C-alpha cells in the first residue's frame, strides 16, 4: 500500500537529500548545528510547541468542515453594510480561486504585474464613474476605516489647522466606532448634527444612512462649502448606478464598500472599500493608486503611481500607514462590473430598489410607520415593543432581519432577494405586497451615461470573460509560475487545501452580525486560532480583528496607549524606532498619537544599544513604546534583543514587537519570552494567507496579560476601540491559517522555520563569492533572509539595482525586495516552500547577471546598450525585424543557456517610465465621449 507524504513534506520545498546537500555546502553536520549558530541561545524555546498533532489534508478538511458545519446559514436581510451576493461562477473559478491571481504580490514591479494592474485600473475607473470624482485609489480595507482615512485627508487638506468633524447623519455603528478610535489620539473632535463652524474640517454625509434613509443635506452641504469644509459622502456603490453621482451634489470625497459587487459577506471580510477624491486632493489620498504610463518603446503600461505619499517612503510623515489593502477583492469587484456592464448593474439595482419600495408600500398600507420617504434597499419600521418578536419569527422562516432597538427593525434587500422573501417578510407585519416597479431613490436619477469604456461592454459571454481573465493572468508572474524571493514578504506556499474552505457556504455566506447561536462554527474556529497563536508567541491574549499588518501595528500601539492612560500616565507619547524599521512603524506610531524618536543602528546593522539606552533614559518620563523588528530588518538575529527590552522596561516603556519576520521564529523562540509586550503577526506572511496581489492581509496582535483589557473591542460586542468594521476583521480567510497550523502541528511549524533559515543561509553562501552579503550575525549566519549588495556592479560597470531587478525578469523571476532596507541592494527571502532546484536557479541567475555586468565593465557591451540596461525584453521586441543590439536575441531572452525555454515567462511590456507616469497622472480610463 502506498504511504502518502504528510502535509509537512508537501509544504516544505527541500527534500531530505536536498537538506543534507545544503548543510554540507555550509560545512555543517546537522540542522541543529545551523540553528545553534544562527539563533541566540538566550532566546531559544527549549520545549515543543503545545499544539494539536498534525492532520492530513483530508482529515483537516473534514475536521474544519464539522466545525464550520455548526454555523447556521440563513438568508440575511440585516444590511448595515453587508449584503448577500451572487458571485458569478466565472469570477469565482477564474479569479477568486485561481492561484495566478491570489498568490501574486503587491505590484511594485510593474513589468510583471500588468494584468492585475490593468484590472485595478478598471476598478478605479468604476469608482470614478460611480462617484463622479476623478481620482480613486485601488482599494482600502473596509468601509469604516475608509471613512476614517477620508477624514484624515480632510484634516491634512487643512494642514491640521481644523480638527472638528461633523457626522451629518446616522452612520453605521461600526463606522462610528472606528472613527472614534482613530479620532482620540489625533485630536479630532467628532460632532453630530448640522452646525458647521470655522473649525470644521469636513462633514460626513451617509448616502443612505444606517436606517436606509436618504436625508435632506442640502443646507448643511451649502454651509460646509461656505465655511471651506470638505464634504465626504459615504455612498452605496450599487445605488449609485441609478442615482446621481455624489460629485454632482457637492461631495469632495466619496467612500464606501464594494462588497456587494460579487464579494461574499464572509462573516465580515475581506472586502474592498473604495475612496474617490477631487483632483485637488490627489496627492494626499491614502493607499495605492494605479496610473497609466508608457514603457521604453512607447507602449501603454500600468504602474503604481505617486508612491512618495506612502509609508515606505514618508514614514511618520506619510498620508497613512496603509500598506496591504484589498487588491484581490477590488479585482473581483471590477470583474463583477465588467461581467454585468452598466445595464446589468442598473438592472440589479433597480430590482433591489423596487423590492424595497414595494415592501415599504405594503407596510404603510398595513399602518406600519417607516423611516423616511427616500430609500434604496432598506426599510426601517417602527414596531413598538415588538422588534425581538418579529425578528424571531423571521428567523423561524430562515431569514435574519436587523433589530435596531426594542421598537425598531430594519429589512435590507439585495440581489439574492426574491418575491417569496418579499411576501414572507411583509407577512411578519400583517402586510401584503402589491406589484409595481416604482423606486424611492431621491433626487435626480443618473441621467448621464456611465461606464461607457469598451471594457465594460465587451465580455458578455462566459467564453469572452474566461479568456479575458486568463489573458490578464498570463501577463503576471505569481507563485504559480516561479519563486518570489521578496525579503520581508514571506511569499510561501498557499496550499490548495488551505484555500478550499474559503469558498464553503458555511464560511462565505454569514453576516457578521448574525445571532451568536448561529455562528458557533466561527466561534470555535477563531477560539482555536487565538489559542494556537498564543502558544506560538507566548502571549496571554490575541485579537484577530486587525485586517492588515499595518492595522495590527496600530491596534498594538493603541493598546499600549490605553494601558498608559489607565495608569494615569497618558503623557507617555514617545515611541523609539530604529532607523532600519519598516515605514509602517513610524506611520502607525504617528496615527497612535506618538512622537517618533529614531534610534541609530551600528555599521554592522545591529541597533546601537548605547544610543537606545541614552534616548530611553532621556525620555524616561514620557517613554511610551519601543518598536523593534526581530529578526532585524537586516535579516539577522541580534544578540542583544533581551537587553533592548530590559532597557525600555526600566524606563517605563512597552516593547512593540513587529512580527514581519516571525517566519524565522515559530517553534524556535517566542516574542513574549524575549520580552515583548505586544506583537502583530502577519497571517499573510508566516501563516499562509496569500497576498492576493496587494491584499487581503490579516494582522492579529498578541499581548501580554496586562494589555489584554486593551485589545480592540467592537460595538456589536458591547465594547469599543475597534480598528476594523467587523469584530473578527477578515474572518473568512482565517480558515486558511487554521488549516495551515492544523496540518503542520508544532513539530511541522518548527521544521518550516528551520527550512526557511537553511534556504536563506544556503543562498547567502552561494552568492557571497560574487556579491557581498551585507549583514550577518554570529558565526557569519543570517536569519531567514539576506541582503545582497549589488552596489558592486554599480561601482564596476554602472549597473544599478533596478537593472538587476529587471534583468531577473528575463531569467523568469520576480525580483527580490529592491533598495530596502539599504539603498542599492536586494533583500532575498526564499521561505521554506521553495525546493533546492528553484533556489539554485535563482542563485545561478544572480551569478550569471554578475557575469553580464563584467562584460559591460570590460567594454564587451556598451554601458547604454546591454541586456541589463535594456531589461526586461518582451517577445515583440525580440522578434523585431531589426536587431541592433551588440548581444544576441538568445542572450536577451534565454540568458544563461541552461534555462528551460518551455517555462519561459514573457513580460508584456519593457521597462516602464515611472517619472513620466507621475508627472502625467492618468488613474482612470476616460469615457468614450472624451475621445469625440
From Swiss-Prot:
GO cellular component: cytosol; glycine cleavage complex
GO BP terms: glycine decarboxylation via glycine cleavage system
Matching InterPro entries: GcvP (IPR003437), GDC-P_C (IPR049316), GDC-P_N (IPR049315), GDC_P (IPR020581), PyrdxlP-dep_Trfase (IPR015424), PyrdxlP-dep_Trfase_major (IPR015421), PyrdxlP-dep_Trfase_small (IPR015422)
Catalytic activity, as annotated: N(6)-[(R)-lipoyl]-L-lysyl-[glycine-cleavage complex H protein] + glycine + H(+) = N(6)-[(R)-S(8)-aminomethyldihydrolipoyl]-L-lysyl-[glycine-cleavage complex H protein] + CO2
Sorted UniProt keywords: Oxidoreductase, Pyridoxal phosphate
GO MF terms, alphabetically ordered: glycine binding; glycine dehydrogenase (decarboxylating) activity; pyridoxal phosphate binding
UniProt-listed Enzyme Commission number(s): 1.4.4.2
UniProt xrefs under SUPFAM superfamilies: PLP-dependent transferases
Protein origin, superkingdom: Bacteria
Positions carrying N6-(pyridoxal phosphate)lysine: 685
Cofactor(s) the protein needs: pyridoxal 5'-phosphate
Binding partners and assembly: The glycine cleavage system is composed of four proteins: P, T, L and H.
HAMAP family assigned to the protein according to its UniProt record, in alphabetical order: GcvP (MF_00711)
PANTHER family linked: GLYCINE DEHYDROGENASE (DECARBOXYLATING), MITOCHONDRIAL (PTHR11773:SF1), GLYCINE DEHYDROGENASE, DECARBOXYLATING (PTHR11773)
Protein name, entry field: Glycine dehydrogenase (decarboxylating)
The species this protein was found in: Brucella melitensis biotype 2 (strain ATCC 23457)
Lineage of source species: Bacteria, Pseudomonadati, Pseudomonadota, Alphaproteobacteria, Hyphomicrobiales
Amino acid at each position: 500500500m502506498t504511504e502518502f507524504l504528510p502535509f509537512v513534506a508537501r509544504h516544505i520545498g527541500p527534500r531530505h537529500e536536498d537538506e543534507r546537500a545544503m548543510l554540507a555546502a555550509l560545512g555543517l553536520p546537522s540542522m541543529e548545528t545551523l540553528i545553534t549558530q544562527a539563533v541566540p541561545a538566550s532566546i531559544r524555546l527549549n520545549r515543543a510547541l503545545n499544539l494539536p498533532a498534525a492532520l492530513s489534508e483530508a482529515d483537516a478538511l473534514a475536521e474544519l468542515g464539522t466545525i464550520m458545519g455548526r454555523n447556521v446559514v440563513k438568508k440575511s436581510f440585516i444590511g448595515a453594510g453587508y449584503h448577500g451576493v451572487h458571485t458569478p461562477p466565472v469570477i469565482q473559478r477564474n479569479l477568486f480561486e485561481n492561484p495566478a491571481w491570489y498568490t501574486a504580490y503587491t505590484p511594485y514591479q510593474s513589468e510583471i504585474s500588468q494584468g492585475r494592474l490593468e484590472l485595478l485600473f478598471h476598478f478605479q475607473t468604476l469608482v470614478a464613474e460611480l462617484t463622479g470624482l476623478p481620482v480613486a485609489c485601488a482599494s482600502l480595507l473596509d468601509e469604516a476605516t475608509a471613512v476614517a482615512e477620508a477624514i484624515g485627508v480632510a484634516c491634512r487638506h487643512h494642514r491640521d489647522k481644523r480638527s472638528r468633524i461633523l457626522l451629518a447623519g446616522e452612520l453605521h455603528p461600526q463606522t462610528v466606532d472606528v472613527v472614534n478610535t482613530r479620532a482620540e489620539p489625533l485630536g479630532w473632535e467628532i460632532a453630530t448634527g448640522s452646525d458647521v463652524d470655522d473649525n470644521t474640517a469636513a462633514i460626513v454625509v451617509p448616502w443612505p444612512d444606517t436606517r436606509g434613509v436618504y436625508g435632506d443635506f442640502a443646507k448643511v452641504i451649502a454651509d460646509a462649502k461656505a465655511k471651506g469644509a470638505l464634504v465626504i459622502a459615504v455612498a452605496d456603490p450599487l445605488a449609485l448606478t441609478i442615482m446621481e453621482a455624489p460629485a454632482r451634489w457637492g461631495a469632495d470625497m466619496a467612500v464606501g464598500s464594494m462588497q456587494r459587487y460579487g464579494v461574499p459577506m464572509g462573516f465580515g471580510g475581506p472586502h474592498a472599500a473604495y475612496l474617490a477624491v477631487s483632483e485637488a486632493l490627489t496627492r494626499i489620498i491614502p493607499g495605492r493608486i494605479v496610473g497609466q504610463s508608457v514603457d521604453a518603446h512607447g507602449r501603454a503600461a500600468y504602474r503604481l503611481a505617486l508612491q512618495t505619499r506612502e509609508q515606505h517612503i514618508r514614514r511618520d510623515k506619510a498620508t497613512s500607514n496603509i500598506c496591504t489593502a484589498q487588491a484581490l477583492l477590488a479585482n473581483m469587484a471590477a470583474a463583477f462590473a465588467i461581467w454585468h456592464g452598466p445595464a446589468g448593474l442598473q438592472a440589479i439595482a433597480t430590482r433591489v430598489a423596487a423590492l424595497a419600495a414595494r415592501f415599504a408600500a405594503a407596510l404603510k398600507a398595513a399602518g406600519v410607520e417607516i423611516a423616511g420617504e427616500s430609500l434604496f434597499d432598506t426599510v426601517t419600521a417602527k414596531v413598538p415593543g415588538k422588534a425581538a418578536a418579529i425578528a424571531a419569527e423571521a428567523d423561524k422562516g430562515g431569514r435574519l432581519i436587523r433589530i435596531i432597538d426594542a421598537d425598531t427593525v430594519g429589512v435590507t434587500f439585495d440581489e439574492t432577494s426574491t418575491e417569496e422573501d418579499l411576501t414572507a417578510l411583509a407577512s411578519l407585519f400583517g402586510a401584503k405586497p402589491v406589484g409595481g416597479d416604482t423606486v424611492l431613490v431621491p433626487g435626480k436619477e443618473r441621467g448621464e451615461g456611465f461606464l461607457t469604456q469598451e471594457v465594460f461592454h465587451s465580455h458578455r459571454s462566459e467564453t469572452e470573460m474566461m479568456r479575458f481573465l486568463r489573458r490578464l493572468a498570463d501577463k503576471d508572474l505569481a507563485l504559480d509560475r516561479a519563486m518570489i524571493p521578496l525579503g520581508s514578504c514571506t511569499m510561501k506556499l498557499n496550499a490548495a487545501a488551505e484555500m478550499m474552505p474559503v469558498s464553503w457556504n458555511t464560511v462565505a455566506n454569514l453576516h457578521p452580525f448574525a445571532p451568536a447561536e448561529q455562528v458557533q462554527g466561527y466561534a470555535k474556529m477563531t477560539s482555536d486560532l487565538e489559542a494556537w497563536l498564543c502558544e506560538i508567541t507566548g502571549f496571554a491574549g490575541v485579537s484577530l480583528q486587525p485586517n492588515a499588518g499595518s492595522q495590527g501595528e496600530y491596534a498594538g500601539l493603541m493598546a499600549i496607549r490605553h494601558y498608559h492612560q489607565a495608569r494615569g500616565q497618558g503623557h507617555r507619547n514617545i515611541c523609539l524606532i530604529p532607523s532600519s524599521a519598516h515605514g509602517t512603524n513610524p506611520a502607525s506610531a504617528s496615527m497612535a498619537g506618538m512622537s517618533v524618536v529614531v534610534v541609530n543602528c551600528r555599521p554592522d546593522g545591529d541597533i546601537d544599544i548605547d544610543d537606545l539606552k541614552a534616548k530611553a533614559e532621556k525620555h524616561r518620563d514620557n517613554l511610551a513604546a519601543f518598536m523593534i523588528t526581530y529578526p532585524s530588518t537586516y535579516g539577522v538575529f541580534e544578540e542583544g534583543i533581551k537587553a533592548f527590552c530590559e532597557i525600555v522596561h526600566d524606563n517605563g516603556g512597552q516593547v512593540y514587537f513587529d512580527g514581519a519576520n516571525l517566519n524565522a521564529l515559530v517553534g524556535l523562540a517566542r516574542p513574549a519570552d524575549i520580552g515583548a509586550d505586544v506583537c502583530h503577526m502577519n497571517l499573510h506572511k508566516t501563516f499562509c494567507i496569500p497576498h492576493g496581489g496587494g491584499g487581503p492581509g490579516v494582522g492579529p496582535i498578541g499581548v501580554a496579560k496586562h494589555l489584554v483589557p486593551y485589545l480592540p473591542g467592537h460595538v456589536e460586542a458591547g465594547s469599543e476601540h475597534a480598528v476594523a468594521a467587523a469584530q473578527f476583521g477578515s474572518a473568512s480567510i482565517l480558515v486558511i491559517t487554521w488549516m495551515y497550523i492544523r496540518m503542520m502541528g508544532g513539530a511541522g511549524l518548527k521544521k518550516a522555520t528551520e527550512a526557511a533559515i537553511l534556504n536563506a543561509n544556503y543562498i547567502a553562501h552561494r552568492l557571497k563569492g560574487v556579491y557581498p552579503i551585507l549583514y550577518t550575525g554570529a558565526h557569519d549566519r543570517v536569519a531567514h533572509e539576506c541582503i545582497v549588495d549589488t552596489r558592486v556592479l554599480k561601482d564596476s560597470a554602472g549597473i544599478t539595482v533596478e537593472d538587476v531587478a529587471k534583468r531577473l525578469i528575463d531569467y523568469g523571476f520576480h525580483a527580490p525586495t529592491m533598495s530596502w532596507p539599504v539603498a542599492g541592494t536586494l533583500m532575498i527571502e526564499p521561505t521554506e516552500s521553495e525546493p533546492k532546484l528553484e533556489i539554485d536557479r535563482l542563485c545561478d541567475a544572480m551569478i550569471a547577471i554578475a557575469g553580464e555586468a563584467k562584460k559591460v565593465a570590460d567594454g564587451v557591451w556598451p554601458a547604454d546598450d546591454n541586456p541589463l540596461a535594456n531589461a526586461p525584453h518582451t517577445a515583440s521586441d525580440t522578434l523585431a525585424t531589426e536587431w541592433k543590439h551588440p548581444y544576441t536575441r538568445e542572450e536577451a531572452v534565454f540568458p544563461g543557456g541552461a534555462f528551460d525555454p518551455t517555462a519561459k515567462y514573457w513580460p508584456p511590456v519593457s521597462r516602464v517610465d515611472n517619472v513620466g507616469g507621475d508627472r502625467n497622472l492618468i488613474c482612470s480610463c476616460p469615457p468614450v465621449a472624451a475621445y469625440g
